[in-house]
């Protein structure tokens, strides 16, 4: 941020001095601006750690463009397309009006563990509405070799495109598109999977785009603009066996916008700057839209997130309202058939009851008569049993009395017999003693 403020102040100072000085002073300002540009590039890429140096793949990176003397030899790894020019240490992709250009790395790159690509770019000389833009490519396969899509590819390409362009409603923005090569990509209607706002037009200070892809970290894909996170996702998975074609392209339509590439570095891994936490996310404006209820005509204002023309976002209250409406419709759709079925069942039950009622009445009458007759016969049987039981009880009483009289007579006879036996035994004893006494007397 400090470098941008300093650059803007120097630019303002250059304009003031230019109005006072004249043509010679303008030339001096141009030279000073060029020196300042080189200083900014050095400041942007001056902080590189030793670990990052070990990961730096110089064979797949641009050389120091300020030191290039033999383009055919030192830039043999790169393909320059259309109107690209190497001027004063930078590639100018669009050197004039209605021009386009591209810069492609000739050898294809295969990811071993992870990769990080850093592009240093600048848009200079124009600010305003334009249909042009700057695209950065990460393609797989041979699809899309034409230049109909921002000077770099056909509409049928397989891979990733990161596009910087001016949106008519929201201004300067960065959008990311994916395509599998089976269908045409239309910038106006095709959906993008990520986006952020980024001011890049007519800037004295170059900007840095850093793209990191790490398959080992659950396919982390992360884009940083000037060390601020534009987006990161783990839902994008590239084909591991297919190598990548890396490049950039631009088109400026009818404007004088000059898209410039100052540096490109490729690292075989994740560098330390890629791990900067997202503590200062890129700001996004709020868009207020007037919504008119088609049923009631009521007007309301709703905030939408950026880039919500294709995919509208809704607030929590609106989400709850829609859920309540959906729940009501579901309940209504569920209850109405149930009510109809219940009413039909009730009608069937009523009809069945009406048909069974005469049969039930006849059965009830027959059951009542039979039950009454059975009750009377049972009562008569009970009376007969009671009488028989009473008669048996009386007979038992009489038999009991008779048995008791006999027992008394037998007991009296037994007493007299016992007494008689005792008397007889006593008499026999005395007679025996008398006989013994008589025998003793005779002996004497």
Swiss-Prot record:
It is a single-pass type I membrane protein. Residues 430-444 are cytoplasmic. SUPFAM superfamilies: Concanavalin A-like lectins/glucanases (SSF49899). Pfam families: Lectin_leg-like. The chain crosses the membrane at residues 409-429. Disulfide bonds join 196-230. One of its GO terms (molecular function) is metal ion binding. Changing residue 432 to A: Impairs interaction with COP1, SEC21 and SEC23 and loss of endoplasmic reticulum exit. Its main location: Golgi. The keyword Signal applies. It comes from the Eukaryota. Belongs to the EMP46/EMP47 family. PANTHER family: LECTIN, MANNOSE BINDING 1 LIKE, VESICULAR MANNOSE-BINDING LECTIN. This is Protein EMP46. It comes from Saccharomyces cerevisiae (strain ATCC 204508 / S288c). The gene is EMP46.
């Amino acid at each position: 941020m400090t470098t941008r403020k300093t650059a803007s102040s120097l630019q303002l100072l250059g304009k003031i001095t230019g109005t006072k000085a004249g043509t010679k002073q303008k030339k001096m300002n141009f030279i000073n601006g060029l020196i300042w540009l080189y200083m900014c590039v050095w400041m942007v890429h001056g902080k590189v750690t030793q670990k990052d140096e070990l990961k730096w793949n110089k064979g797949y990176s641009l050389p120091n463009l300020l030191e290039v003397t033999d383009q055919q030899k030192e830039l043999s790894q790169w393909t320059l397309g259309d109107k690209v020019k190497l001027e004063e240490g930078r590639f100018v992709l669009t050197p004039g009006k209605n021009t386009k250009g591209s810069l492609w790395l000739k050898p294809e790159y295969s990811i071993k563990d992870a990769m990080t690509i850093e592009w240093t770019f600048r848009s200079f000389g124009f600010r305003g509405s334009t249909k042009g833009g700057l695209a950065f490519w990460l393609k797989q396969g041979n699809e899309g070799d034409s230049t109909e899509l921002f000077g770099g590819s056909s509409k049928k390409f397989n891979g990733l495109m990161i596009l910087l362009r001016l949106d008519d409603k929201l201004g300067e923005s960065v959008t990311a598109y994916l395509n599998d090569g089976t269908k045409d990509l239309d910038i106006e209607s095709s959906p993008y999977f990520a986006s952020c706002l980024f001011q890049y037009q007519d800037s004295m200070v170059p900007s840095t785009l850093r793209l990191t892809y790490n398959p080992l970290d659950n396919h982390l894909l992360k884009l940083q603009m000037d060390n601020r996170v534009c987006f990161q996702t783990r839902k994008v998975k590239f084909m591991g066996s297919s190598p990548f074609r890396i490049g950039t392209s631009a088109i400026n339509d009818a404007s004088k916008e000059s898209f410039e590439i100052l540096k490109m570095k490729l690292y075989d891994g994740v560098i330390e700057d890629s791990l900067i936490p997202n503590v200062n996310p890129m700001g996004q404006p709020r868009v207020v839209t007037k919504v008119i209820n088609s049923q009631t005509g009521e007007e309301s204002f709703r905030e939408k997130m950026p880039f919500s023309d294709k995919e509208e976002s809704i607030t929590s209250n609106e989400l709850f309202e829609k859920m309540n409406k959906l729940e009501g419709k579901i309940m209504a759709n569920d209850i109405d058939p149930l009510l109809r079925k219940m009413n039909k069942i009730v009608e069937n039950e009523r009809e069945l009851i009406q048909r069974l009622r005469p049969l039930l009445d006849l059965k009830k009458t027959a059951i009542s008569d039979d039950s009454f007759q059975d009750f009377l016969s049972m009562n008569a049987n009970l009376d007969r049993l009671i009488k028989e039981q009473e008669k048996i009880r009386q007979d038992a009483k009489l038999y009991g009395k008779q048995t008791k009289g006999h027992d008394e007579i037998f007991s009296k006879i037994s007493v007299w017999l016992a007494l008689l036996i005792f008397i007889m035994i006593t008499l026999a004893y005395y007679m025996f003693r008398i006989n013994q006494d008589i025998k003793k007397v005779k002996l004497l």
